[in-house]
Amino acid sequence: VLAGQTFSDEERITARGKDVLVIGGGDTGSDCIGTSNRQGAASVTQIEIMPKPPVGYNPATPWPQWPVVLKTSSSHEEGCVRRWSLSSTRFIGENGRVCGVEVEEVDWLPAPDGGRPQMRPTGRKEILKADLVLLAMGFLKPQLPDLPENVFVAGDAASGASLVVKCIASGHRAAQEVDRYCTTGQR
C-alpha cells in the first residue's frame, strides 16, 4: 500500500525467491540488502565501484575529512556477498526481464595533483546473475543538461542528495509542473 493505493501481486516488486544485485554501497544500499533479505531473496550481492575501505582508522582521510572506513550494518550481518572495485557495464535480459549484469573490475590510481583518485577499467569482466537489480548509487552533484521542455526532474536528481521528505516535496512540485504542462502546454 502506498498513499492509500493497493498494488496487485503482478505490480508489486519483491525480492522473494530472486537473486538480488544491489549496485551501490551506502546507507541506501544497506537498506536494499535488509529489505531483500526480509522479503526472502534467494541471494543478495552488493557491488561498489570504490575499493574496499580499511577497517578502523584510514590515514587517507584524517580529521576533519569524512572518515572512509568499512561500515558493516545490521543489514549486512543478515547476509549478503559484498564486492568492491566493480563497475556495472551492461544489463543482460531475456524475454524483457533482467537476468544478469556485466561488471568490470576497476583500479583506482592516485591523482597526480593529490586530488580525487582516478578510475581505470581493467578489462576483466564477468556476468553476475540477477533477476532483481536495485540501484543505490550516489553522485557528486546534479549535472543537468538543458532538458527538453517535456522532461521533468525531481528529488536528488534535481537538487543533489538530501532528505527523503525534501525529495517528496520536490516530486510534488514536479507533478504540478507536469500537470500544468499537460493541461496548458506551458511550463
PLM region descriptions:
Residues 1-187:
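Residues forming the flavin
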